[in-house]
Regions:
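C-terminal motif of bacterial Sec signal peptides marking the signal peptidase cleavage site
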Residues: 15-17
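Residue-level detector of conserved, function-critical positions
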Residues: 21-309
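Sec-dependent N-terminal signal peptides
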Residues: 4-13
Length: 309
């Protein structure tokens, strides 16, 4: 399912290392752009710079470097976490087939004894022993038992107090809090994230719908696919056709089209036939009114397109 997640994990907060250089106000000179020749020393360099840190690989081993090529974590691990700010968080790494955690200087802070590991969120992280997941603290002490089939990262959303985590048990997904109390029952084939949303897309008995923070059904489980945008509209798929509804279950665009793309500015691109070309589509606003026949779409979608047919 293509579900829009509208914000990033709170652990990845700082992207300053990837911004374009700014002008020095004292000299009016633009600082030189760092040379990227250092990348030739590696077999692979992560294409996206996050938090001034990139993942690198050489001879089948991974490490971390900054955007100038300075080695931050030695290239000696079978895998290593990327996209984290080293001054904010520990990161997992894999060595000799096992997972552990490193600090910002590359020192081992939790030994390599686990079969899987997830990002540390606050004081806890999900780790795997055998075929089950549990949660440990920063002293490597067990906080929650190893009883879960799968586990994600604890996070704090708009309403999520206490912090919740998406976990799987008995083949079904639900949410627990940091005490292990079940908040959303293990009743779903799939669950998306709440984050800052009031609602969560959920799949039950093979069909998609939406629930709220109290597990109340907001949108019934009758759709083959759902995709929301800004908590205003939901693109729904049913029996091979697509349409748009809102969170009050009101039909905005009838479920009678082959492809619908949710766009910015409350607009939608509609393909009434299976032929998804520029010549066969048109634009509608949120009220279902025709905006344009799409003659200008190629230029328009260079900046406005969010989804591709």
């Amino acid at each position: 399912m293509k579900h829009i997640v509208l914000f990033s994990l709170f652990l990845s907060l700082n992207f300053l290392g990837c911004q374009s250089p700014t002008t020095d106000k004292k000299t009016n000179d633009v600082p030189p752009i760092p040379s990227e020749s250092w990348k030739a020393n590696y077999d692979w360099v992560e294409p996206i710079c996050e938090n001034n840190v990139v993942k690198v690989r050489k001879n089948h081993k991974f490490g971390l470097a900054d955007h100038n090529g300075k080695v931050l974590i030695p290239v000696e691990y079978e895998d290593i976490e990327s996209g984290v700010s080293l001054n904010l968080n520990w990161l997992w790494a894999k060595k000799d087939g096992k997972y552990g955690y490193l600090d910002e200087n590359g020192a081992v802070v939790i030994p390599f004894i686990y079969d899987g590991a997830k990002t540390f969120s606050g004081l806890m992280a999900a780790v795997k022993k055998g075929d089950k997941w549990g949660f440990i603290n920063r002293d490597a002490e067990e906080e929650l038992p190893f009883i879960y089939d799968e586990a994600e990262v604890f996070y704090q959303g708009k309403w999520l107090s206490p912090t919740l985590c998406l976990v799987k048990k008995g083949g079904k997904w639900g949410y627990i809090n940091t005490e292990g109390t079940v908040i959303i029952p293990f009743a779903y084939d799939e669950l998306d994230d709440f984050f800052t949303d009031d609602y969560c897309a959920a799949k039950k008995n093979g069909k998609w719908g939406y629930i709220d923070k109290n597990n109340k059904v907001i949108i019934p489980f009758i759709y083959d696919e759902v995709e929301d945008y800004d908590l205003k509209y939901i693109r729904v798929v049913k029996d091979g056709k697509e349409g748009i509804i809102d969170f009050n279950r009101k039909t905005v665009i009838p479920i009678d089209f082959y492809v619908i793309n949710l766009l910015g500015d409350d607009a939608m691109r509609i393909f009434p036939t299976k032929e998804t070309t520029i010549e066969t589509c048109f634009l509608l606003d949120s009220l279902g009114n025709c905006i344009d026949g799409c003659e200008y779409i190629p230029e328009y979608y260079k900046t406005h397109k969010l989804f591709y047919p």
